[in-house]
């Protein structure tokens, strides 16, 4: 069960990173410029985009806001019985 939880966290971080990278590229911003806008080190941008960032939530939010994005929380969706039967 712990392994599955870690995989879910990993997938969430990878998805966040993909969204950050996509938004940055769409805006034509390089990592160094985004780092300046968010007042973080360029390394933070790289770690976020690769889904391996382990720093503070505040820094991640600073990067997200610098891209003109926001974070929305929603209840976790659990698999349906049909989805579980198909595994």
Per-region residue spans from a language model:
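DNA major-groove recognition helix of helix-turn-helix/homeodomain DNA-binding modules
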Residues: 58-74
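Short, charged recognition helix plus adjacent turn
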Residues: 1-4, 73-87
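Recognition helix of helix-turn-helix/homeodomain-like DNA-binding domains
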Residues: 39-53
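A short, Lys/Arg-rich alpha-helix, primarily the initiator
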Residues: 2-26
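Short basic helix-loop element that most often maps to the first helix and adjoining turn
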Residues: 18-37, 62
